[in-house]
Amino acid sequence: MKITNFAMLAGVAAALSACGGSNVVEPANLDDARVFYSFNSAEISEEARANLLGQAMYLKSNADVKVQIAGNADERGTTEYNLALGQRRANAAKEVIVKDGIDAKRISTISYGKERPLVKGTGESVWKFNRNATTTVK
């Protein structure tokens, strides 16, 4: 599994937050920026919120950029259920960015459900990575 620049910045943001510093870091780019979710949930965690606010900061600095947020799920559940869950995850991520001032027209959403796992395999150590919303530049 590759670790993107954004993932490293998200880690820095989490460390700064733990130290009482700013918890929002603007990424250098949006190369497969991801936020992760708990099982059967589309709720945005504080770590995910910081990540998404960093994405919004990037979009504010790059007004011509449009993105797509793809919601994903782990392999448990039916195809239909996971497609709906993936869409809720993508929509929840989009909502955070839009509430921070980004025009909703710049963000499209799609769900892949369980069809495009980030990591192949079974078990929670794998599934936790497949429950995500991934932002890519269009």
Region locations from a protein language model:
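Short, solvent-exposed beta-strand/turn patches at coil↔beta or beta↔helix junctions
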Residues: 24-54, 74-79, 117
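Short beta-alpha junctions and helix-cap segments that line functional grooves
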Residues: 120-123
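C-terminal motif of bacterial Sec signal peptides marking the signal peptidase cleavage site
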Residues: 15-18
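Hydrophobic helical h-region of N-terminal Sec-dependent signal peptides
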Residues: 10-13
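Bacterial N-terminal signal peptides that target proteins for export
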Residues: 1-8
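Extracellular/periplasmic catalytic domains that process cell-envelope and extracellular macromolecules
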Residues: 28-29, 125-129
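Extracytoplasmic/secreted proteins, especially bacterial periplasmic and envelope-associated proteins
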Residues: 47-54, 80, 84, 88, ...
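A non-catalytic structural micro-motif
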Residues: 64-72, 87-118, 131-138
